[in-house]
């Protein structure tokens, strides 16, 4: 028997859809669902087997550990936020937003979940799927850039319009999109989180072959963003630093305790930038959050505020 769920937290996708669809002549979407039920919207409980993923889902991979964490939360508290769906056929529904909740609910052993059934056209479904994914906290920079580019392509948006739709600055959106210009090898390192956005941006000024070589060394040797910036500047100035199997001499490259290193990685993934933990004696230490420019700092603050709000 399923555990009774607490009162549902009905939350929309913010002003993103309003900015995107309202300005393009589509139906305007209120800032939050809680302010009033949308026309044609029905709150229901459906069997998990009645739902299927959307063909417009831009996210290709979902972290198994993160799904397991969400499943544990659902076991304890139930599904707080309903899954948004649209009807496909008799007794079958397509997930518009909330596929992670659906998958985690299956892991948690639930047989039914709360849903909001909406009457939505393909255009709106695409917009909701893209915006939900872009606003997620655990996307790597390349996934964000790819989702933003698809949003721009689907709706013929300028960078400024895309920024308004997802609640980012225009500069932050433009910087993310530049990552798509990088060679495949560097994009792969970004995808696997072996490089950060700051590393990749420093490499944009170099020729593709040289950028690829420097990126591989940076990932293998664990260079900091500052180290990569310094070496890229040397190449741009006509100097050729030796990058053959030399580890950075920066104190930050000293080996960390396994548990500290694991914590640093987890925090870095959550905040989207490098995080260093300097753990001293008697349990004292420092937590250092690195940022290469104000856009990166902006992103860190957004993620921290989102955590506090939740």
From Swiss-Prot:
<dbReference type="Pfam" id="PF02195">
    <property type="entry name" value="ParBc"/>
</dbReference>
<dbReference type="InterPro" id="IPR004437">
    <property type="entry name" value="ParB/RepB/Spo0J"/>
</dbReference>
<keyword id="KW-0238">DNA-binding</keyword>
<comment type="similarity">
    <text>Belongs to the ParB family.</text>
</comment>
<dbReference type="InterPro" id="IPR057240">
    <property type="entry name" value="ParB_dimer_C"/>
</dbReference>
<dbReference type="Pfam" id="PF17762">
    <property type="entry name" value="HTH_ParB"/>
</dbReference>
<dbReference type="InterPro" id="IPR003115">
    <property type="entry name" value="ParB/Sulfiredoxin_dom"/>
</dbReference>
<feature type="region of interest" description="Disordered">
    <location>
        <begin position="239"/>
        <end position="259"/>
    </location>
</feature>
<dbReference type="InterPro" id="IPR036086">
    <property type="entry name" value="ParB/Sulfiredoxin_sf"/>
</dbReference>
<dbReference type="GO" id="GO:0045881">
    <property type="term" value="P:positive regulation of sporulation resulting in formation of a cellular spore"/>
</dbReference>
<protein>
    <recommendedName>
        <fullName>Probable chromosome-partitioning protein ParB</fullName>
    </recommendedName>
</protein>
<dbReference type="GO" id="GO:0007059">
    <property type="term" value="P:chromosome segregation"/>
</dbReference>
<comment type="function">
    <text>Involved in chromosome partition. Localize to both poles of the predivisional cell following completion of DNA replication. Binds to the DNA origin of replication.</text>
</comment>
<keyword id="KW-0159">Chromosome partition</keyword>
<feature type="region of interest" description="Disordered">
    <location>
        <begin position="1"/>
        <end position="35"/>
    </location>
</feature>
<dbReference type="InterPro" id="IPR050336">
    <property type="entry name" value="Chromosome_partition/occlusion"/>
</dbReference>
<dbReference type="GO" id="GO:0003677">
    <property type="term" value="F:DNA binding"/>
</dbReference>
<dbReference type="InterPro" id="IPR041468">
    <property type="entry name" value="HTH_ParB/Spo0J"/>
</dbReference>
<dbReference type="Pfam" id="PF23552">
    <property type="entry name" value="ParB_dimer"/>
</dbReference>
<dbReference type="GO" id="GO:0005694">
    <property type="term" value="C:chromosome"/>
</dbReference>
């Amino acid at each position: 028997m399923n555990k009774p769920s607490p009162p549902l937290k009905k939350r929309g996708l913010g002003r993103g859809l309003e900015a995107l669809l309202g300005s393009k002549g589509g139906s305007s979407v209120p800032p939050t669902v809680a302010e009033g039920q949308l026309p044609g919207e029905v709150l229901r409980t459906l069997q998990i087997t009645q739902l299927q993923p959307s063909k417009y889902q831009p996210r290709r991979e979902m972290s198994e550990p993160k799904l397991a964490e969400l499943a544990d939360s659902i076991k304890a508290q139930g599904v707080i936020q309903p899954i948004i769906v649209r009807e496909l056929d008799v007794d079958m529904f397509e997930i518009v937003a909330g596929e992670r909740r659906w998958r985690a609910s299956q892991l948690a052993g639930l047989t039914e979940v709360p849903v909001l059934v909406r009457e939505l056209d393909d255009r709106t479904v695409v917009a909701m799927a893209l915006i939900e994914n872009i606003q997620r906290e655990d996307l790597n920079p390349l996934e964000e850039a790819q989702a933003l580019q698809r949003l721009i392509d689907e709706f013929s948006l300028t960078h400024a319009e895309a920024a308004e739709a997802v609640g980012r600055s225009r500069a932050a959106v433009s910087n993310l999109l530049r990552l798509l210009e990088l060679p495949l090898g560097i994009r792969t390192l970004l995808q696997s989180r072996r490089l950060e956005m700051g590393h990749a941006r420093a490499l944009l000024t170099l020729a593709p072959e040289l950028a690829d070589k420097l990126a591989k060394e940076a990932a293998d040797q664990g260079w900091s963003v500052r180290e990569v910036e310094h070496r890229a500047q040397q190449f741009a100035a006509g100097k050729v630093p030796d990058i053959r199997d030399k580890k950075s001499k920066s104190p930050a490259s000293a080996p960390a305790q396994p548990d500290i290193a694991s914590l640093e990685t987890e925090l870095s993934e959550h905040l989207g930038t490098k995080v260093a933990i300097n753990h001293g004696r008697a349990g004292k230490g420092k937590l250092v959050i690195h940022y290469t420019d104000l856009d990166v700092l902006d992103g860190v603050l957004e993620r921290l505020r989102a955590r506090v709000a939740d």
